[in-house]
Regions:
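Conserved core of the sugar-phosphate nucleotidyltransferase
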Residues: 1-66
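Conserved alpha/beta core of the MobA/IspD/sugar-nucleotide pyrophosphorylase nucleotidyltransferase superfamily
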Residues: 43-116
């Protein structure tokens, strides 16, 4: 899944960007995943939400790590580099996630404020 990329996220290397051309239903296939971009065109904020068919999952786990996967620290590249298709849908909003200590602080504050 993807959502719109905010301007403040363009240079943030903790935010994975997905290169996708979406159709009129806001669906498409990922072409690439990167951490650094120069332009927002066809790039979206990647949301690490996956579903697999049993056959695809078995194929994926039996593939060796690729250079791009290791170099970029992005497991999605194993699939892309091995010509597996990753279908993408665009969501209206980015659900909260915890990938960094800063994210954890934001989530804790969110829960604290909602429980007051």
């Amino acid at each position: 899944a993807v959502c719109n990329l905010e301007n403040s996220e363009i240079r943030d290397t903790n935010i994975v960007k997905a290169n996708v051309i979406l159709d009129e239903k806001n669906e498409g296939f990922a072409k690439d995943f990167v951490r650094v971009i120069k332009s927002k065109k066809n790039f979206y904020h990647h949301i690490g939400l996956y579903t697999y068919t049993p056959i695809s999952l078995e194929k994926y786990v039996n593939l060796k790590q690729t250079f791009n996967e290791i170099n970029r620290s992005l497991e999605q590249m194993r699939a892309i580099d091995n010509k597996m298709k990753i279908k993408v849908v665009k969501l209206k909003n980015n659900p909260p996630s915890v990938d960094t200590m800063e994210d954890l602080k934001k989530i804790r504050l969110l829960f604290k404020n909602n429980n007051s």
